[in-house]
Amino acid sequence: MSEHRIAMVGTPCEIMAASKLQHYTDSPIDVKLGLFCMENFSYKYFEHLLKEYDLKMDDIEKFQIDKGFVFLLLKTREIVKIPLSVAKRIIRKNCNICVELTSETSDISIGSIGSDDGWSTLIIRTEKGEEIVNGALEQKFIEAKELTDSRFNLLNKLAENKINKNLEEMKN
């Protein structure tokens, strides 16, 4: 066993690969923090898209997808709104066959779906994840409140939609 232990943050496909790695090698990965992910953009093509808006990666402070748009909060505090229909062309092709939204093989899943502004939704998936979250709460590094049933149902609905859409894509 490696003496160096690390925590890994990744999308569902990256977390799934890390989970498999833990079973077959002397993996240093001790904790897996999985992000919610509908799809991911190719970095190279995202840079090209930004050029169309006279922007660079370094200009962006925050990135958010909401209500059919990609919102870019720039360091200048300006907001750039790109229609998701335009951004769809730079989605990584392998995302069209991924059926995972919430990083189910992680210790803790994290995302904005179901969250109020300034908050993140956490799903604790393992004992290790529970220890980490409880420790962070005790140390007052984070605050927590329960996710309402309606917001939890929204998360489940979006996860189901992703599964159904991408299973259909795999048939074609």
Predicted features along the sequence, with ranges:
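Short, charged, surface-exposed secondary-structure boundary motifs
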Residues: 39-49
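Short active-site oxyanion
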Residues: 3-7
